[in-house]
Amino acid sequence: MLLPTRTTRLALAGLASVALLAGCTASPDGDAPAGGSSASGGVASLVSADAKSTVDEVKASLGEPTAKDGTKLCYITRTLSNEFWGYERDGFEAEAKRLGVQYQTFDVTDESSITEQLDKAKSALNQGCSAILASPISATGLDSVFQSALAAGIPAIVLNDAKSSLPGVVYVGPDATTIGGTAADYIAGKLPDGGKVAMIEGDPGSSNAINRGDGFTAALKDHPGLDLVASQTASWDQTKAQEIATTMLTANPDIAAFYSQNDGMALGVQAAIDAKGLTGKVILVGTDGIPQAKKQIQAGAYTATVSELPTTEGATGVDVALWLLAGKQVPAWVDVPAFIVDGQNVAQYATGMP
């Protein structure tokens, strides 16, 4: 992976957005039948259980993927009102188009509706998909669909967030626990003398929220000078995050740092900090690396974000699907590490998401 640290960088160019129609996008030939697979019937055996490699290692080992005529990939994503998932979709669709693969994208309207996403995933199974890719809302929410797909010889691939524990399902994305730990370590570096910190959590049922929170609190134990005085869910909602952060700052006016489990909520925290006249005085670390957060980092109102690589993840999911369909062995975890974006390097990532 070209972005495993704060010093190595990757830039994917030319990944264009595709217009979304009626909660579902498809390639021009989206209704064509799915192509056959040399892995059909035994696709789960092609996934190396417990194996983990970076995306660059996997690409170097397996080479450029190719597709048979009629191959169609289906991606079940989250709500596209969250621009992070829009970039994930863009990576998926751009790579599918680059490789001449038919595709179809299914999104949900409610970020917390496991039922809605499950219904979309079940529908995808009936659309002639050669492989199923998904960004599940919960760790087990789409397992029944994954099981059905694998039983039919259809690869199942998770892009970011809820890593399934089912054998044969490939996960493409970062370690969410490490993301939380990275945020805690960064804050500790900014507060060498310690101080009070607060955390704004995502939806309680979200694997990302759970794992990022666990990583953050675990890492705080390595920094005894940091005192977690408040932690509350805002369920990925910016307005709720602003209200909660305002209450936290009223109760603890000497809070020195906030960690928000995504950038959308962090923008709400920033508004609360600004309203208290504390702009630039309270450390604010978000997660995801969305463009709006990076604009605020450039303006000096927002300290840092632990940036993920959704465009890279979406594109890599296409590659993994095609490798599996070609009968190639793939690790169960294709790691796409996150990295810190702050005032020192934000100019390199001011627009878009890698």
What are these regions (language model features)?
Residues 2-13, 19-354:
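A residue-level marker of the well-folded mature domains of exported/periplasmic proteins
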